[in-house]
Amino acid sequence: LYAKRGTPLHSLICGGAQERGMRAGTENLPAIAGMAAALREACANLEQNAAYVAGLRDRLIAGLETIPHSLLSGDRKNRLAGNVNFCFEGVEGEDLLLDAKGICASSGSACTSGSLEPSHVLLAVGVPYEAAHGSLRLSLSAENTPEEVEYLLKAVPEVVTRLRSMSPVWRDLEEGRKSHVI
Protein backbone atom coordinates (compact mmCIF):
# COMPACT_ATOMS: atom_id res chain seq x y z
CA LEU A 1 0.00 0.00 0.00
CA TYR A 2 1.49 3.33 -1.05
CA ALA A 3 0.29 6.52 0.58
CA LYS A 4 1.78 9.92 1.29
CA ARG A 5 2.70 10.34 4.95
CA GLY A 6 -0.06 12.11 6.81
CA THR A 7 -2.78 11.18 4.32
CA PRO A 8 -5.83 10.00 6.28
CA LEU A 9 -6.78 6.49 5.15
CA HIS A 10 -9.70 4.33 6.23
CA SER A 11 -9.88 0.59 5.89
CA LEU A 12 -12.28 -0.70 3.23
CA ILE A 13 -12.30 -4.24 4.61
CA CYS A 14 -12.20 -4.72 8.37
CA GLY A 15 -10.41 -7.64 9.94
CA GLY A 16 -6.71 -8.52 9.99
CA ALA A 17 -3.76 -6.25 10.44
CA GLN A 18 -2.28 -6.58 6.96
CA GLU A 19 -0.92 -3.42 5.35
CA ARG A 20 -0.64 -1.60 8.69
CA GLY A 21 -4.23 -2.46 9.57
CA MET A 22 -5.58 -0.88 6.39
CA ARG A 23 -6.48 -4.01 4.40
CA ALA A 24 -7.64 -7.30 5.80
CA GLY A 25 -6.99 -10.55 3.98
CA THR A 26 -4.17 -12.56 2.53
CA GLU A 27 -2.57 -11.61 -0.76
CA ASN A 28 -3.57 -13.82 -3.70
CA LEU A 29 -0.14 -15.37 -4.23
CA PRO A 30 -1.13 -17.58 -7.21
CA ALA A 31 -2.49 -14.52 -9.03
CA ILE A 32 0.61 -12.49 -8.16
CA ALA A 33 2.89 -15.28 -9.46
CA GLY A 34 0.75 -15.61 -12.60
CA MET A 35 0.94 -11.87 -13.24
CA ALA A 36 4.72 -11.96 -12.82
CA ALA A 37 5.01 -14.83 -15.34
CA ALA A 38 2.72 -13.04 -17.80
CA LEU A 39 4.74 -9.82 -17.51
CA ARG A 40 8.03 -11.69 -18.02
CA GLU A 41 6.68 -13.33 -21.17
CA ALA A 42 5.19 -10.09 -22.52
CA CYS A 43 8.43 -8.17 -21.95
CA ALA A 44 10.60 -10.96 -23.41
CA ASN A 45 8.71 -10.83 -26.71
CA LEU A 46 7.91 -7.12 -26.85
CA GLU A 47 10.12 -6.14 -29.81
CA GLN A 48 9.30 -9.29 -31.80
CA ASN A 49 5.56 -8.81 -31.22
CA ALA A 50 5.73 -5.10 -32.12
CA ALA A 51 7.48 -5.90 -35.42
CA TYR A 52 4.95 -8.63 -36.24
CA VAL A 53 1.97 -6.38 -35.46
CA ALA A 54 3.50 -3.49 -37.44
CA GLY A 55 3.72 -5.83 -40.45
CA LEU A 56 0.02 -6.68 -40.11
CA ARG A 57 -0.76 -2.97 -39.74
CA ASP A 58 1.21 -2.04 -42.84
CA ARG A 59 -0.57 -4.74 -44.89
CA LEU A 60 -3.93 -3.47 -43.63
CA ILE A 61 -3.04 0.13 -44.48
CA ALA A 62 -1.85 -0.82 -47.97
CA GLY A 63 -5.09 -2.69 -48.64
CA LEU A 64 -7.51 -0.11 -47.21
CA GLU A 65 -5.96 2.79 -49.07
CA THR A 66 -6.98 1.14 -52.36
CA ILE A 67 -10.59 2.02 -51.51
CA PRO A 68 -11.45 5.18 -53.48
CA HIS A 69 -11.83 8.33 -51.37
CA SER A 70 -10.29 6.79 -48.26
CA LEU A 71 -7.80 8.51 -45.97
CA LEU A 72 -5.36 7.11 -43.42
CA SER A 73 -5.64 9.21 -40.26
CA GLY A 74 -2.28 10.21 -38.82
CA ASP A 75 1.26 9.50 -39.88
CA ARG A 76 1.97 6.34 -41.87
CA LYS A 77 4.96 5.14 -39.79
CA ASN A 78 5.00 7.17 -36.56
CA ARG A 79 2.05 5.41 -34.97
CA LEU A 80 1.38 2.56 -32.60
CA ALA A 81 2.11 -0.81 -34.16
CA GLY A 82 -1.46 -2.00 -33.67
CA ASN A 83 -3.38 1.14 -34.63
CA VAL A 84 -5.13 1.79 -37.94
CA ASN A 85 -7.70 4.54 -38.40
CA PHE A 86 -9.21 5.23 -41.83
CA CYS A 87 -11.86 7.67 -42.98
CA PHE A 88 -14.17 6.75 -45.85
CA GLU A 89 -15.89 9.67 -47.53
CA GLY A 90 -19.65 9.39 -47.96
CA VAL A 91 -20.10 6.88 -45.15
CA GLU A 92 -21.14 7.39 -41.53
CA GLY A 93 -18.75 5.79 -39.03
CA GLU A 94 -21.38 4.12 -36.88
CA ASP A 95 -22.76 2.41 -39.99
CA LEU A 96 -19.27 1.11 -40.76
CA LEU A 97 -19.09 -1.00 -37.64
CA LEU A 98 -18.57 -4.53 -38.81
CA ASP A 99 -20.13 -6.66 -36.04
CA ALA A 100 -22.29 -8.53 -38.55
CA LYS A 101 -19.08 -9.70 -40.27
CA GLY A 102 -17.56 -10.85 -36.98
CA ILE A 103 -15.16 -7.90 -36.82
CA CYS A 104 -14.74 -5.75 -33.72
CA ALA A 105 -14.10 -2.13 -34.69
CA SER A 106 -14.89 1.38 -33.50
CA SER A 107 -15.85 4.62 -35.15
CA GLY A 108 -13.90 7.79 -34.47
CA SER A 109 -11.01 7.90 -32.05
CA ALA A 110 -10.84 6.25 -28.65
CA CYS A 111 -11.27 9.62 -26.93
CA THR A 112 -14.67 10.26 -28.50
CA SER A 113 -16.25 6.80 -28.37
CA GLY A 114 -20.01 7.16 -28.11
CA SER A 115 -20.14 10.73 -29.45
CA LEU A 116 -21.96 11.62 -32.67
CA GLU A 117 -19.57 14.50 -33.33
CA PRO A 118 -16.43 13.79 -35.33
CA SER A 119 -13.32 13.24 -33.26
CA HIS A 120 -11.50 16.44 -32.30
CA VAL A 121 -8.29 14.39 -32.53
CA LEU A 122 -8.97 13.45 -36.16
CA LEU A 123 -9.80 17.07 -36.95
CA ALA A 124 -6.56 18.20 -35.24
CA VAL A 125 -4.43 15.86 -37.40
CA GLY A 126 -5.96 17.36 -40.54
CA VAL A 127 -8.86 15.06 -41.39
CA PRO A 128 -11.62 17.13 -43.08
CA TYR A 129 -14.79 17.47 -40.98
CA GLU A 130 -16.97 15.62 -43.51
CA ALA A 131 -14.49 12.75 -43.78
CA ALA A 132 -14.05 12.41 -40.01
CA HIS A 133 -17.67 11.22 -39.81
CA GLY A 134 -16.70 8.11 -41.79
CA SER A 135 -13.93 7.02 -39.46
CA LEU A 136 -13.13 3.39 -38.71
CA ARG A 137 -10.64 2.48 -35.97
CA LEU A 138 -9.10 -0.98 -36.01
CA SER A 139 -6.72 -2.39 -33.41
CA LEU A 140 -4.35 -5.26 -33.98
CA SER A 141 -2.33 -7.44 -31.60
CA ALA A 142 0.19 -10.26 -31.73
CA GLU A 143 -2.80 -12.61 -31.48
CA ASN A 144 -4.07 -11.53 -34.91
CA THR A 145 -3.12 -13.48 -38.02
CA PRO A 146 -2.38 -12.51 -41.63
CA GLU A 147 -5.55 -14.42 -42.58
CA GLU A 148 -7.61 -12.14 -40.34
CA VAL A 149 -6.10 -9.08 -42.03
CA GLU A 150 -6.98 -10.54 -45.44
CA TYR A 151 -10.54 -11.15 -44.19
CA LEU A 152 -10.72 -7.48 -43.15
CA LEU A 153 -9.43 -6.42 -46.56
CA LYS A 154 -12.26 -8.34 -48.18
CA ALA A 155 -15.00 -7.24 -45.75
CA VAL A 156 -14.31 -3.50 -45.38
CA PRO A 157 -14.48 -2.60 -49.11
CA GLU A 158 -17.72 -4.61 -49.43
CA VAL A 159 -19.30 -2.75 -46.51
CA VAL A 160 -18.06 0.66 -47.73
CA THR A 161 -19.44 -0.01 -51.23
CA ARG A 162 -22.80 -1.17 -49.84
CA LEU A 163 -23.12 1.84 -47.52
CA ARG A 164 -22.12 4.29 -50.24
CA SER A 165 -24.78 2.82 -52.55
CA MET A 166 -27.41 3.86 -49.97
CA SER A 167 -25.88 7.22 -49.02
CA PRO A 168 -27.47 10.45 -50.29
CA VAL A 169 -24.19 12.24 -49.42
CA TRP A 170 -22.22 9.83 -51.62
CA ARG A 171 -24.76 10.27 -54.43
CA ASP A 172 -24.31 14.06 -54.22
CA LEU A 173 -20.53 13.62 -54.35
CA GLU A 174 -20.64 11.26 -57.32
CA GLU A 175 -23.11 13.45 -59.24
CA GLY A 176 -21.03 16.58 -58.66
CA ARG A 177 -23.48 18.42 -56.39
CA LYS A 178 -20.79 18.33 -53.69
CA SER A 179 -17.00 18.23 -53.96
CA HIS A 180 -14.93 15.34 -52.64
CA VAL A 181 -12.74 16.27 -49.68
CA ILE A 182 -10.52 13.17 -49.88
Name these PLM-found stretches.
Residues 1-50:
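Conserved core segment of the aminotransferase class I/II
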Residues 10, 71-73, 106:
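Structural detector of well-ordered beta-strand residues that form the stable sheet scaffold
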Residues 28-32, 46-57, 89, 93, ...:
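Generic structural signal for well-ordered, non-membrane alpha-helical segments
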Residues 39-46, 57, 64, 68, ...:
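Structural signal for hydrophobic packing residues in well-ordered secondary-structure cores
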Residues 43-96:
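Conserved PLP-dependent catalytic core of the aminotransferase class-I/II
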Residues 84-137, 142:
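Conserved C-terminal alpha-helix-loop-beta "cap" of PLP-dependent enzymes
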Residues 118-182:
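PLP-dependent enzyme catalytic core of the Aspartate aminotransferase-like
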